[in-house]
């Protein structure tokens, strides 16, 4: 694993090798049309990943852009599984923070993830856009938030799991589209720390 950070830019890359990984697999029960799930040891699996994150500041506008690359390789030797070839997955995220005033802030989060094959599950691409507004009162002690998630109803759950001589699929919407409101109160806005009276110093010195 390699991590490099310079000012508002960070880079991360890594490689994992797992010997005898436990993988969730669908199996036919006694050759009948009955499928059950179980964990099975495979020979080995490998993962590679790269991530770049940029979080500059432009006065009242604070963006955070992230690009991720991941790819997994599972050895299925000895199993009757007809899964697609391994392919890379890319994840794009853009978090936008707008400091409209000292007490009013707006957040716009956009995310897109390409299709990927992880172990035995192939997941299709999905996207999501969220928006949020916060307003603070009483010197930031009271914070009111209003949010809306998955504005365009694009965060769908679509996957195919390849098992031992069988295939399972799911294509649906998880009903993540919603609006809501939050209210929070911060009891220690000054971030003061209680230092104590030193009553335990004698015991600590003894130990």
Where are these regions (language model features)?
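Outer-membrane beta-barrel proteins
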Residues: 1, 36-42, 53-55, 80-84, ...
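C-terminal beta-barrel architecture of Gram-negative outer-membrane proteins
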Residues: 69-74, 89-137, 149-152, 160-161, ...
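Outer membrane beta-barrel strand-and-loop segments of large Gram-negative receptors
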Residues: 5-66, 75-87, 91
């Amino acid at each position: 694993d390699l991590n490099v950070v310079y000012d508002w830019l960070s880079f991360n890359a890594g490689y994992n090798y797992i010997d005898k990984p436990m993988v969730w697999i669908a199996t036919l029960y006694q050759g009948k049309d009955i499928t059950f799930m179980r964990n099975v040891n495979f020979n080995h699996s490998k993962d590679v990943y790269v991530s770049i994150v940029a979080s500059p500041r432009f006065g009242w506008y604070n963006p955070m852009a992230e690009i991720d690359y991941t790819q997994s390789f599972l050895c299925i030797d000895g199993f009757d599984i007809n899964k697609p070839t391994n392919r890379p997955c890319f994840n794009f995220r853009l978090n936008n923070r707008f400091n409209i005033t000292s007490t009013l802030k707006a957040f716009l989060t956009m995310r897109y993830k390409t299709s990927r094959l992880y172990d035995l599950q192939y997941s299709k691409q999905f996207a999501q856009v969220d928006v949020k507004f916060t307003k603070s009162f009483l010197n930031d002690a009271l914070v009111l938030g209003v949010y809306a998630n998955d504005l365009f109803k694009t965060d769908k759950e679509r996957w195919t799991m390849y098992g031992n001589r069988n295939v399972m699929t799911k294509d649906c919407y998880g009903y993540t589209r919603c609006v809501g409101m939050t209210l929070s109160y911060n009891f220690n806005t000054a971030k003061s720390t209680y230092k104590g009276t030193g009553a335990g110093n004698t015991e600590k010195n003894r130990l």
